[in-house]
């Protein structure tokens, strides 16, 4: 990773102490700033250092599917459910549609989820990875926040990735400790571009094209990487003038399209004009 040593060291330092004190961290930043990359590197570190790593990611099309996010997260450890007290076991199984019970109280679900995680962590420390938390369903958001506030006595670390400047229920995660992820500085941006150019091959980019990409990307790692690749594919002939729009890729359009779609209708209308 380029420009993320401080954040990575913050995460791994906290993770090495979870046997004494568990914790949760919310990695907060703009689209494309590298939240997923940081979480992936942290998960790989944890996997190599004796942790069981559990993953989930919010999906925009599943925000109305109750408990979908936390079911994906804890599905691999559901074998520990029989060790829970009866009322917790029933609550959890009912929430996941695995028992014919009335939908339980959200508090009971939170307590049961915490109990399941603690039971699994008694055998091996856990690293819980929650990416794109802004797209979790409301019930999963409630559980993740509930559990994140109560990990101090468990050998568990929870990492959540959350987009900055959000409204709505996802902001409840901001009650947890935050780790802001900003843009890259000029040297880091140039280093990333050089690595992308080297990886893509071909004729690279002219100095003027490189300056244009760095200026428009403004330190956003995804923008730097994707604009560089798009320009190499298109060729420098696309750089007719400073007023010529840079070619983009589907990946970068998708990242910022989701941010656009999350805006209220009046704001979307204004930006579309």
Question: Model regions: which residues?
Answer:
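N-terminal pre-P-loop "Q-motif" helix
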Residues: 1-14
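Winged-helix-like regulatory helical subdomains adjacent to P-loop NTPase cores
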Residues: 5, 22, 243-273
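Helix-loop-helix "sensor" segment of P-loop NTPases
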Residues: 16-17, 80, 99-101, 157-159, ...
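Pre-Walker A (Motif I) flank of P-loop NTPase domains
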Residues: 20-25, 124
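P-loop NTPase Walker A phosphate-binding motif
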Residues: 30-64, 79
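A conserved switch/coupling segment of P-loop NTPase cores
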Residues: 44-45, 49, 111-181
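Conserved Walker-type P-loop NTP-binding/catalytic site
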Residues: 67-127, 155, 179, 190-194, ...
């Amino acid at each position: 990773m380029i420009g993320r040593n401080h954040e990575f060291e913050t995460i791994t330092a906290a993770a090495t102490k979870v046997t004494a004190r568990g914790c949760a961290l919310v990695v907060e930043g703009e689209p494309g700033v590298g939240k997923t990359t940081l979480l992936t590197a942290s998960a790989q570190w944890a996997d190599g250092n004796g942790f069981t790593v559990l993953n989930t990611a919010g999906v925009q099309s599943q925000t109305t599917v109750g408990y979908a996010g936390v079911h994906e997260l804890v599905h691999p450890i559901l074998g520990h459910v029989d060790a829970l007290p009866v009322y917790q076991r029933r609550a959890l199984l009912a929430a996941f549609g695995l028992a014919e019970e009335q939908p339980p109280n959200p508090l009971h679900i939170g307590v049961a989820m915490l109990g399941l995680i603690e039971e699994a962590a008694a055998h091996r420390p856990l690293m819980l990875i929650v990416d794109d938390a802004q797209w979790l369903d409301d019930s999963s958001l409630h559980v993740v926040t509930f559990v994140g506030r109560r990990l101090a006595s468990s050998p568990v670390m929870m990492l959540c990735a959350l987009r900055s400047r959000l409204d709505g229920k996802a902001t409840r995660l901001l009650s947890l400790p935050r780790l802001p992820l900003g843009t890259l500085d000029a040297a880091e941006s140039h280093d990333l571009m050089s690595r992308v150019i080297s990886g893509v091959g071909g004729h690279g980019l002219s100095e003027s094209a490189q300056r244009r990409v760095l200026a428009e990307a403004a330190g956003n790692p995804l923008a730097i990487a994707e604009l560089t690749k798009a320009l190499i594919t298109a060729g420098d002939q696309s750089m007719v003038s400073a007023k010529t729009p840079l070619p983009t890729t589907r990946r970068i359009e998708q990242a910022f399209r989701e941010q656009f779609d999350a805006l209220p209708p009046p704001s979307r209308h204004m930006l579309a004009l």
